[in-house]
Amino acid sequence: MLFRSRVFRKVWEMACWAGFLAGRESARLMLPHGQGNIFFTGATASLRGGSGFAAFASAKFGLRAVAQSMARELGPQNIHVAHLIIDSGVDTAWVRERREQLWGKEALNNPDLLMPPASVAASFWQLYQQPRSAWTFELEIRPFGEKW
């Protein structure tokens, strides 16, 4: 917890407050139509904190609570709210560069440690296509090589 309160607040604003605002405004537009979908993206930190990740974990825990509260409030109004926990990095150029900086080129050798964006999108699409008789609130996805 050796960081400034300003950093903690900024992380919370980006990872929790922004999600609340986006969800609120989305719901406001969907309610008159009597249907819709609002999906929040979580992370491993949505379920457990880690050393050095107090700000991020508290924000992701918070976003999960926002999503759950919105699901209970908006579900009866035919708006599907779900929280998707991504327990891994998503395979993008930025993530690959960051992994290489932190752990060297060998960090990129195992293709089973990052999720392709198309795989993540397929999970969101699966949620979107669900009939309301079997809505999922929370879905946790991870690549084959991720330890849990």
PLM regions and their residue ranges:
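Catalytic Tyr-X3-Lys loop
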Residues: 4-20, 39, 63
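Active-site loop of short-chain dehydrogenase/reductase
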Residues: 8, 30-43, 76-79
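Short-chain dehydrogenase/reductase
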Residues: 12, 16, 52-61, 113-114
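Amphipathic alpha-helical dimer-interface segment in Rossmann-like NAD(P)H-dependent oxidoreductases
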Residues: 14-32
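Conserved catalytic-core motifs of eukaryotic protein kinase domains, centered on the activation segment
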Residues: 33, 50-51, 95
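Catalytic loop of short-chain dehydrogenase/reductase
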Residues: 37-62, 68, 72-75, 90
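C-terminal helical subdomain
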Residues: 76-79, 83-88, 102-148
